[in-house]
């Protein structure tokens, strides 16, 4: 396939166009007076949202060159969302402003590497500042307050999040599920586990918006070996298909023909499945698979040592769970189908091993297993009158939970873009003997005004006046309330941000902006001429895969 290479001023113009597009599209949603965006969907009616992250992911520019840069800019929002669960729109506005300012310096023939160096020096100083002004939160009451603020003042949501954290610990596993009742909003602790392994292939994803796999009442197939052939699994998988249930395969690895066949079957809609690599290595992997077997109630697992093959399994041998959630980095098993007495016996066995071992390393790993197996999972159940209302409430609770976790982890800072604005004073003291590096510092310094300016503009006020007044006050806790249109104390008014969200938004923005500042060329494929033929996914059954 032929391609096109662009560089120089043409490339800079494409980068500017992409940055302008994402900022103008997502920026309008920022702040309490942010405006909604209507998005057309490939199925169903249009969606109205104030979620900048959703808007960014919906952008599909017709110009292939602009589309590639938009894709790269999306990494800033994805990084912010993955690491902190929020701050995506702030990251977008920051990176857009940095690119806009960097273009002037690139046009003036400044050293791009020195610009990058200055930007990173500025980033490091601002991160130190954010960490220095962050206020730690510890009590259940403070956690409830942060949760309430994160949920736009909903004290019930804040209270339930605090209750859940109190039950399983601040580092414990908390999931949000759809409830059955009209006004249901409850907290319960069930048997469960989370481990640090995600899906083998992103093609298994069932929720593209959150980039996760979600299954209700799935089977769990465990294998302490690599699975590379699909044929031995066909009879079992055909039975699972007829039961209209999903299956999660947790194995040493799933590769080759087995992985390809599972992915294609999932994409065709004939099988709901996901493959996950088993946690740990060697003997430790065997022990963790046994933990999962007991938790899920599986009768056995595939193992050469045990003489158990995939062909010999029936659905009665598989484990079950009320739900399983899988991201690219982790797997959460909620309410496994194992017997409580068997789980308690396993916990007792691990405790005995901890007492007997003399190795600090082994003791640490055993304690990790104990925490995973005995800690349980807190489940927040959210109900509503309609499916739309339940989804909206569930999304709101999940957003508040992410923000609260971030706040518990690194503390809270004044919100509304005020913390980044006050960090300008720190960069005023940061200087470089190299003019080009100083220009890089100034790129970040100028960008720190952008988020609060966008919030103020969305509220219909003059951003230049507001930012000037706040900088002149030299009070880091003084912010502008964009809803009430007045200056207030951030902590007294409850307008705060998790420090982690602000930090990650800045780091993500500088990371992506630095790449674009130093980029010399862009290669895109040229459209191919239509010769009347088309490439299609093969339909019907696949050879050697039975009827699923």
From Swiss-Prot:
Q: Which domain of life does the UniProt lineage start with?
A: Bacteria
Which chemical reaction does it catalyze?
ATP + H2O + a folded polypeptide = ADP + phosphate + an unfolded polypeptide
The cross-references to Gene3D superfamilies, in alphabetical order and at most eight, read: GroEL, GroEL-like equatorial domain, TCP-1-like chaperonin intermediate domain
Q: Name one Pfam family in it.
A: Cpn60_TCP1
Swiss-Prot/TrEMBL keywords: ATP-binding, Chaperone, Cytoplasm, Isomerase, Nucleotide-binding
Q: Which class of enzymes does this protein belong to?
A: isomerase
> Binding positions for ATP?
29-32, 50, 86-90, 416, 497
What's any GO biological process attached to this entry?
protein refolding
The principal location of this protein is cytoplasm
Entry EC no(s): 5.6.1.7
GO: which molecular function terms?
ATP binding; ATP-dependent protein folding chaperone; isomerase activity; unfolded protein binding
* GO cellular component: a single term: cytoplasm
Subcellular location as annotated:
Cytoplasm
**Into which family does the record put it?**
Belongs to the chaperonin (HSP60) family.
Query: How the protein assembles, per its UniProt entry?
Result: Forms a cylinder of 14 subunits composed of two heptameric rings stacked back-to-back. Interacts with the co-chaperonin GroES.
UniProt xrefs under HAMAP family:
CH60 (MF_00600)
Summarize the protein's role. Answer: Together with its co-chaperonin GroES, plays an essential role in assisting protein folding. The GroEL-GroES system forms a nano-cage that allows encapsulation of the non-native substrate proteins and provides a physical environment optimized to promote and accelerate protein folding.
Q: What is this protein called?
A: Chaperonin GroEL
């Amino acid at each position: 396939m032929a391609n096109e290479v662009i560089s120089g001023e043409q490339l800079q113009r494409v980068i500017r166009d992409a940055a302008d597009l994402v900022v103008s599209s997502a920026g309008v949603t920022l702040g309490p007076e942010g405006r909604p965006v209507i998005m057309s969907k490939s199925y169903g009616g249009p969606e109205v949202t104030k979620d900048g992250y959703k808007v960014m992911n919906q952008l599909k520019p017709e110009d292939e060159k602009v589309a590639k840069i938009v894709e790269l800019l999306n990494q800033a929002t994805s990084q912010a969302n993955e690491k902190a669960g929020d701050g995506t729109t702030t990251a977008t506005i920051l990176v857009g402003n940095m690119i806009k300012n960097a273009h002037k310096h690139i046009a003036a023939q400044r050293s791009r590497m020195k610009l990058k160096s200055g930007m990173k020096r500025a980033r490091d100083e601002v991160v130190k500042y954010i960490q220095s002004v962050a206020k730690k939160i510890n009590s259940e009451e403070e956690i409830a307050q942060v949760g309430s603020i994160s949920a736009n003042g909903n004290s019930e949501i804040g209270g339930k999040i605090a209750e859940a954290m109190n039950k399983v610990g601040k580092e414990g596993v908390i999931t949000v599920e759809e409830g059955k009742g009209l006004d249901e909003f409850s907290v319960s602790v069930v048997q469960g586990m989370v481990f640090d392994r995600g899906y083998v292939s992103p093609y298994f994803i069932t929720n593209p918006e959150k980039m996760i796999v979600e299954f209700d009442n799935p089977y769990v197939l465990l294998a302490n070996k690599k699975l590379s052939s699909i044929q031995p699994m066909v009879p079992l998988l055909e039975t699972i298909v007829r039961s209209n249930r999903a299956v999660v395969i947790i194995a040493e690895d799933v590769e080759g023909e087995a992985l390809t066949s599972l992915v294609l079957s999932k994409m065709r809609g004939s099988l709901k499945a996901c493959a996950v690599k088993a946690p740990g290595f060697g003997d430790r992997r065997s022990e963790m698979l046994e933990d999962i077997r007991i938790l899920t109630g599986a009768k056995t697992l595939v193992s050469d040592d045990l003489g158990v093959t995939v062909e010999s399994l029936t659905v009665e041998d598989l484990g079950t769970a009320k739900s399983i959630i899988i991201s690219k980095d982790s797997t959460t098993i909620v309410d496994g189908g194992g017997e409580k007495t068997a789980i308690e016996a396993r916990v007792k066995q691990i405790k005995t091993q901890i007492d007997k071992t003399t190795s600090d390393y082994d003791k640490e790993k055993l304690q990790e297993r104990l925490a995973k197996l005995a800690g349980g999972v807190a489940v927040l159940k959210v109900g509503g009158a309609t499916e739309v209302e339940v989804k909206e409430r569930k999304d709101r609770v999940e957003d508040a939970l992410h923000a609260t976790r971030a706040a518990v982890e690194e503390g809270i800072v004044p919100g509304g873009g005020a913390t980044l604005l006050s960090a300008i004073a720190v960069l005023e003291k940061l200087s470089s003997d190299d003019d080009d590096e100083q220009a890089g510092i100034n790129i970040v310094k100028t960008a720190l005004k952008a988020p609060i300016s966008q919030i103020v503009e969305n509220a219909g006020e003059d951003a230049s006046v507001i930012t000037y007044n706040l900088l002149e006050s030299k009070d880091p806790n003084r912010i502008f309330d964009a809803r009430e249109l007045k200056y207030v104390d951030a902590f007294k008014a409850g307008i705060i941000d998790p420090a982690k969200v602000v930090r990650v938004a800045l780091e993500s923005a500088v990371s992506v902006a630095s790449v674009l500042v130093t980029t010399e060329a862009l290669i895109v494929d040229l459209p191919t001429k239509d010769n009347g033929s088309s490439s299609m996914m093969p339909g019907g059954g696949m050879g050697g895969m039975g009827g699923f």
